[in-house]
């Protein structure tokens, strides 16, 4: 009987420690929120300029020619040339 009582006592102690530690972790996560640090420019950009800057940032404006530049050239010049024979290097 004493062995079962010791086992139950250690299980209860372990369970209480797990509950206590999880509660402390919960409190730490809830109360340790840090706000974002925002750095604003001294002179805010206008709406149109800001949109253009975002387009340049995410889509790399200026790297590709505009769509209108392909209009008068036909389809064949805008496509890659297909080789007439297999490439010996990659076969």
Swiss-Prot record:
PTM-bearing positions, type Hydroxyproline: 83, 86
One biological process term in Gene Ontology: cell-cell signaling involved in cell fate commitment
Domain of life: Eukaryota
Signal peptide boundaries: 1-35
Glycosylation sites: 86
Similarity comment: family membership: Belongs to the CLV3/ESR signal peptide family.
Protein name: CLAVATA3/ESR (CLE)-related protein 27
UniProt organism field: Arabidopsis thaliana
């Amino acid at each position: 009987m004493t062995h079962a009582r010791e086992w139950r006592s250690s299980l209860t102690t372990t369970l209480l420690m797990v509950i206590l530690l999880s509660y402390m972790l919960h409190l730490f996560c809830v109360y340790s929120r840090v706000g974002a640090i925002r750095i604003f420019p001294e002179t805010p950009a206008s709406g149109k300029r800001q949109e253009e800057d975002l387009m340049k940032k995410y889509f790399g404006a200026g790297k590709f020619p505009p769509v209108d530049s392909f209009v008068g050239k036909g389809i064949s010049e805008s496509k890659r040339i297909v080789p007439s024979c297999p490439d010996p290097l990659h076969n």
